[in-house]
């Protein structure tokens, strides 16, 4: 997932789940990428879809 355009102050409510390496489901790429930034890049995609 390319997170180069993040973090963003607000994400849409689009539902395209991403499962992170922390076993948490993020509602979409924007929310996932904002979490990646907060984790200093340690968070990765486990798979697309719910965890």
Swiss-Prot record:
Keyword hit for Zinc: no
Keyword Repeat attributed: yes
Record remark: domains: Avian ovomucoid consists of three homologous, tandem Kazal family inhibitory domains.
SS bonds (residue pairs): 3-33, 11-30, 19-51
Kazal-like domain segment(s): 1-49
GO cellular-component term (any): extracellular space
Organism: Polyplectron napoleonis
Signal peptide: none
Record Gene3D superfamilies: 3.30.60.30
Keyword terms: Disulfide bond, Glycoprotein, Protease inhibitor, Repeat, Secreted, Serine protease inhibitor
Feature type site, description Reactive bond 3: 13-14
The name this protein goes by in its record: Ovomucoid
Sites where a glycan is attached: 40
Main location: secreted
Superkingdom of the organism of origin: Eukaryota
Pfam families assigned to the protein according to its UniProt record, in alphabetical order: Kazal_1 (PF00050)
Alphabetized PROSITE patterns for the sequence: KAZAL_1, KAZAL_2
One function term, GO molecular function aspect: serine-type endopeptidase inhibitor activity
